[in-house]
Amino acid sequence: MANAAHRFTEYRKTMALLNILHYPDKRLHKVAKPVDKVDDRIRKLVADMAETMYAAPGIGLAATQVDVHERVIVIDVSEDKNELRAFINPEIIWSSDGKQVYEEGCLSVPGIYDEVERPDRVRVRALNEQGETFELDCEGLLAVCIQHEMDHLMGRVFVEYLSPLKQSRIKTKMKKLERAM
């Protein structure tokens, strides 16, 4: 994924931090549309999303979270934050029967963490920043992250996997936090 890192560097001079929407903002439930053409606008979006994700700090960000309703995700689960991956029009083409439980958090739900069960391995097909199709087998944290971010593209937030009681408590907490800001 050196291409994404290269593009990130190339656009660094013009990058902007984007505002991250917070749950329960209704715009987080909007389904993202496919990207028609991978062009400089999309590459700039990837760079801006990466800058925003690193600054937050986070390990993944979907365009939906920054109020851009197109199928674009950036992820970097590396310890050194030097393995940026961009996924344009991602789709899961295979998932294992095995499950894993990870404690998830989200930049759109700051301060909230809870366990979510997901397939432990997935294969993703997407476009890179040059508009070329690639496939990637994911496991562990990368598999969790790609599924979490793809949920955002479908208008779903991880807390919606939790019980109705937990969801209600989180909504109340987030609304109080928003009023305090």
Swiss-Prot record:
- Top EC category: hydrolase
Q: Has keyword Protein biosynthesis?
A: yes
Cleaved signal peptide residues: none
What reaction gets catalysed by this protein? N-terminal N-formyl-L-methionyl-[peptide] + H2O = N-terminal L-methionyl-[peptide] + formate
Recite the UniProt cofactor note for this protein. Answer: Binds 1 Fe(2+) ion.
Q: Which cofactor does it need?
A: Fe(2+)
User: Which EC number(s) does UniProt give?
Assistant: 3.5.1.88
Q: Which Gene3D superfamilies match?
A: Peptide deformylase
- Name the positions where Fe cation binds: C106, H148, H152
Which residues are annotated as active site?
A: E149
CDD domains given in the database record: Pep_deformylase (cd00487)
GO biological process, any: co-translational protein modification
Per UniProt, the keywords (alphabetical) are:
Hydrolase, Iron, Metal-binding, Protein biosynthesis
Q: Tell me the GO molecular function terms.
A: metal ion binding; peptide deformylase activity
Give the free-text miscellaneous remark of the entry: The submitted crystal structure binds Zn(+) rather than Fe(2+).
Identify the NCBIfam families for this entry: pept_deformyl, PRK00150.1-3
Family under the similarity heading: Belongs to the polypeptide deformylase family.
Record's HAMAP family? Answer: Pep_deformylase
Functionally, this protein is described as follows: Removes the formyl group from the N-terminal Met of newly synthesized proteins. Requires at least a dipeptide for an efficient rate of reaction. N-terminal L-methionine is a prerequisite for activity but the enzyme has broad specificity at other positions.
Stated name of the protein:
Peptide deformylase 1
Biological classification of the source: Bacteria, Pseudomonadati, Pseudomonadota, Betaproteobacteria, Burkholderiales
